[in-house]
From Swiss-Prot:
The protein's name: Protein-glutamate methylesterase/protein-glutamine glutaminase 1
Highest taxon above the source species: Bacteria
Active site, renumbered: S167, H194, D290
UniProt keyword Methyltransferase, yes or no: no
Alphabetized Pfam families for the sequence: CheB_methylest, Response_reg
HAMAP family hit by this protein: CheB_chemtxs
GO BP annotations, alphabetical order: chemotaxis
Keyword Cytoplasm included in the entry's annotation: yes
GO cellular component: cytoplasm
Gene3D superfamilies in the cross-refs: 3.40.50.2300, Methylesterase CheB, C-terminal domain
Modification comment: Phosphorylated by CheA. Phosphorylation of the N-terminal regulatory domain activates the methylesterase activity.
Amino acid sequence: MNRTRVLIVDDSVVIRSLLRQILAQEADLEVAGVAANGHIALRMLDQLAPDVVTLDIEMPEMNGLETLRELRRTRPRLPVIMFSTLTERGAVATLEAFSLGASDYVTKPSNSRPGGQGVEAIRAQLVPKIRALCRKERPALPPLPQKFNRDTSFPGVPITAVAIGTSTGGPNALSQVLPRLPKGFPVPVFVVQHMPPMFTRFLAERLNRECAIPVREVEEQEVVQPGTIRVAAGDHHMTVERMGLGFQLRRSQGPPENSCRPAVDVLFRSVARAYGAGVLAVVMTGMGQDGFRGAQTIREAGGTVIAQDEATSVVWGMPGYVANAGLAERVLPVTEIGNEIVRRVSLGAAMRRGA
């Protein structure tokens, strides 16, 4: 068996020891080496040729962001998983790491002593992410017969809402898609990105600086407005409900689905109920299959589904399940998704004007 080789970069002796302990228990993973700071790690890359790097954000001499910036000059495709804290500073730094090319991140709990629950929390995050990133996770679901073959180049029902779901690689994908939506975009956009509390707020703030239409983390019982983007809050599901002649956004802490809260499936089911055939759903890069069942529900309601292609996905898990099941009417590179959203919404707006 060819084991996946991991280079651990962390200034903490305790964390380095814990990661060694975690990886030693996985038959398909091995520690290629350890480094206490970025300078040492960069010197070790040629010698060790790791398959993936775990990189702490806060380190002396050369921190994780500086290390990542240098690493990406020579190794643009090497998977890098950042280690961050559940703090405002950690959230901001993690989003900056994504802009520099980080593949994913793991949050360090306050309790990470040997034998503590923190160790299992790190294991539960880290091991699946290493496997997904290094094996370019392919969905196990076999292709299913195409049941939804409606040609929506000229859709019969105008698009009245856009719902987007993403996970691993999502922040960068969203930064490539959402800024394409122009000022005056006529429908609301709802986004689920798998992230913990605080991280989602800073993600929304970053996207708001990049986009032509306002972006904000969703608030409880918020009235849906066209031409706005709302991001689900970490540790809360986001749903859309009818309210008289309009719609309302809700936050809830119902049970996780697909081990996720917020979950894409929860959002997709709610928009299918609220908007029916007027939904345009987009499933982008991410591990696992969150969004698959919700995409089925949207297609059964007459809505439209687009999936990101494998070549531009960091992990082709979520969009791959949707594409392989024949649920996606189009499978597109991330660079084309924003324009496709605008095209389909514009067709519907033109239909309404001509009605």
